Regions:
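Generic secondary-structure signature for well-ordered alpha-helical cores
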Residues: 16, 32-35, 115
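Short glycine/threonine-rich catalytic loop with a Thr-x-Gly-x-Asp
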Residues: 19
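Generic N-terminal amphipathic, Lys/Arg-enriched alpha-helix
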Residues: 2-16
């Protein structure tokens, strides 16, 4: 898994400035909450999940469709009409494949960050 500085560099080049600032804020808040309620391992996981939760959000629609097909991510009729809804599921795959995340807790946090589980 990439270290947080390398992740930030990569995200800065792939996200809009607004999304990047949002991402840094989410990681910061996730870190604060994890410090309050968990141990150092939870803090680390929370920061990674916070940084990567929207890693696929700014992908163009056609790219999202292509990657969903390539990564075998199910896309229902509602998602087909509103392709941005795939971003948490696609984001988990991108985190795994492009950022080297193997920890299932982090991947699940990314996958379910819009709806919870």
């Amino acid at each position: 898994m990439l270290d947080t500085e390398k992740i930030k560099e990569k995200l800065q080049s792939s996200l809009s400035i607004e999304r990047y600032i949002h991402t840094l804020g989410v990681a910061e808040e996730a870190e604060k909450l994890a410090k309050r309620y968990g141990d150092e391992e939870l803090v680390k996981k929370a920061v990674y999940a916070g940084l990567l939760h929207d890693c696929a959000k700014d992908y163009p629609a056609e790219m999202k469709r292509r990657f969903c097909k390539e990564y075998h991510i199910p896309v229902d009729d509602i998602m087909k009409k509103q392709i941005d809804l795939v971003h948490p599921f696609l984001g988990a795959e991108v985190a795994k494949r492009e950022y080297g995340v193997e920890d299932e807790d982090i991947l699940e946090a990314i996958r379910w960050h819009t709806t919870g589980k």
